[in-house]
């Protein structure tokens, strides 16, 4: 089948690192690691797997960082290449393994891309502590080959579909997934809403596990899909307090308000004024950025993960405040951590999704997200601003990477 394939080599890494700042030819172009090529159409590895025809798949910030070789190498041991990218997946079932009793050919589904111990083929008694508690995002076996057989060999190492040599992602026409990864899409959700279930579930996972306390003011930093999804998730899961969104551009501010932000501020003076309105007093050190005492935000969701956003989060947080990191922060040079101890702050990161406690039952984040999308009828489909056929992938990646110019929020590929 014709699909996009990404490979990691030292020459491509060096080329992208040296020229990527100047030209996309070295990242998303023909000199980069991504190309359209023939790859084997995947067969079902076992009886409890399903075959899928991809309807659409999103492009996320992690994809852009990986393809441009700007992502930290810390997670490199937990992937395998060459790989067909794409982990935000909407698909239709093409084939059902004989051990799968509750799915049918033709169903629209979304795919949890995380590769749990169950997907790797390990028996229940050998599942790692994370997978036993329904948190495959931190699977402790991701760096090892599995026992599931793909052809004549064991399943390669890897944490997720899209960064895995044996399991193609959504940037190709066909893929396979284990039954535990499959979630049927309600008829009430159109395709553009459904393809967002994966990124929306990241914000939902954080909102359910690090929710605001009654009466707390919340600041959400960022205006991409994760930040906007977090705003929606907070409101959809029941938060009714003050929710301030920090967004740079008018179209992002409109989306933030539509999804539940009570106030939207721009970075800089407007954000500073929102902080002062909490009772914060500004002080100017001999050198460096302005700092504050008193007031502050008791809960900040940093959905950017950049040096400037993390610095702001640390300065804007109230004493004993919580900072939730959803922005895939990696190598941050010269970050002043003084206020972590001087304000007794709590920093907590979240990755992916999994089993949650919800309305008196245990449910997967994807199920909760779809349930609440139907209930709230929120205009999340408006986050999908650009849709491209797969063969226009270079244009699509450029639009996603240059979102200030293109006004892209979520860019989607259709094989």
Label for each model-derived stretch:
Residues 1-88, 108, 169, 173, ...:
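Short N-terminal strand-loop motif that marks the start
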Residues 40-57, 72-133, 137, 186-188:
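Glycine-rich beta-strand-centered segment in the early N-terminal region that forms part
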Residues 76-78, 117-221:
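NAD(P)H dinucleotide-binding glycine-rich loop of Rossmann-like/cofactor-binding domains
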Residues 217-223, 228, 235-308:
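Adenosine-nucleotide cofactor-binding segment
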Residues 315-333, 347:
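ADP-ribose/adenylate-binding Rossmann-like module
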